[in-house]
Amino acid sequence: MEKALLEIEEKARLARAASRPLSYASSAQKDAALKNIARCLLDNEPAILEANLKDQNEAKASGMLPAMLDRLIIDQSRLEGIAKDTFAIAALPDPVGEIFDMNTMPNGLIIGKKRVPLGVIAAIYESRPNVTVDIASLCLKAGNAVILRGGKETIHSNTILAKLIRQAVEQAGLPKEAVQFIENTDRNLVNHLLKLSDQIDLVIPRGGAGLISYVKQNSFIPVVAGGIGVVHVYVDADAKVTDAVNIAYNSKVQRPTVCNAMDTLLVHKDIAPVFLPAVAAEWSKAGVEIRADEAALKILENTFGCKLIPATPDDWGKEFLALIAAVKVVDSLDEALSHIARYGSGHTESIVTQNYTSSQRFLNEVDAAAVMVNASTRFTDGSQFGLGAELGISTQKMHARGPMGLKEITSYKWIVYGSGQIRG
């Protein structure tokens, strides 16, 4: 264990040393590194898929549920998508070096801010191997060194991806030490990593509630946490039924294992008799289990093919990460807002309505990172928000909120131009 701890410290030291030249590397050089990464992924598809298959087989042998298994799979299509996202990050404007908030003082001093990298970012994450590439690419683009620590369930995939990323970075003339990967999945090493505040500037955990809570409780380093999503869709009395069905279906079914999938459907009592049977009929085709309150049960009890069970108090405020939806009929917008305030996690909330006043109340009163009107909750995503990709979706308010892109992993320094001024 002592040797492993020393290796962690050495990786952090190397990342810190590499962060300095990376901080002032040219945009062209950083973009070249990202394009190299994307090409390396495509050129090494057989090796990546083989490594991922090992992860899949080990996950199946351990009894991992199919819904969770989907998170760690890389196939040809997903690999091409990862490469496409990496090219997209390369095409984004470089935030580093941006000059803003310039002002001339009465004494003639010109004072403003210049955007700079944070320095070294440690990413601790579970399941999804695409996170290895997304986070490394975003950190490099923003001039940050990165320390990657994935979960044991994707160790084979992450190992080869990190190796290829380091090769691609070095080919672009940047220090490969700017990307560090921790192969050892012992949790005690994470605890040690979280104490290296002299070498690491920010920790970003991505995963389940257990991981995020552990990192928050044990870190000596600032943490920006995301990923926990208890997500609601509220169908207002003035909703367009076809839109509401499509949004509720997409929010739940399109990819149920991710944090921006809907967990609870709130339905106004005036539209529930028409809307609920319609959405239940569509959900039944996808195998969605409905956990309904008493009012919803009465409406849906004769719906053919519907997987229907009574909701329990534990179903409200629960992130299902599966084809399960809690459904509640509410008397008013006020009741919907109160329910969301009590049970929401501050991730994403959506209202479906044709009533402008209701939509504005929802936007103003719901406290979440992303609040939507007449749109699927699945849009809360870095690529969908025009960020290229994301490091995570922060449900905090400091220092970043919602999908974290390039600007969210930079800081600024004050710059001052004088002409010989001295302070009296």
UniProtKB/Swiss-Prot annotation:
Pfam families: Aldedh (PF00171). It is found in: Cytoplasm. Its EC number is 1.2.1.41. GO terms for cellular component: cytoplasm. Its main location: cytoplasm. Transmembrane segments: none annotated. It comes from Dehalococcoides mccartyi (strain CBDB1). PROSITE patterns: PROA. This is Gamma-glutamyl phosphate reductase. Belongs to the gamma-glutamyl phosphate reductase family.
